[in-house]
Amino acid sequence: MISSLTPEIIYEDKDIIVCHKPAGVPTQSNRIGTKDMVSILKNHLIKNTAKKTASREPYLAVIHRLDQPVEGLLVFAKTPAAAKELSRQLTTSGFGKYYRAQALGIFEHNEGTLEDY
């Protein structure tokens, strides 16, 4: 879990935030009071924005999600223009999600595909 709900920011500029999502933390939740990456990052933006806009919540768009049990990097857009461009890149192979699994034990095959429905 996130210690004291401080996000681990990997990269941030005026348009995007790339952060590490720990296992167990949802990317986004519709339940009031649930700590998720969206609310954690919005709090980060409120605390660290140079021009304090107290009357307006910061813009933050989820570009892709990771399941709650999964940890990894998430990309968020800080502007509508960045959200549009990143969404376009995601659908046209500009960038994507890659998974790495760690497994224990002795396996019959060195390679394979795991499908979980």
Which residues are covered by each model-predicted region?
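RNA pseudouridine synthases
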Residues: 1-117
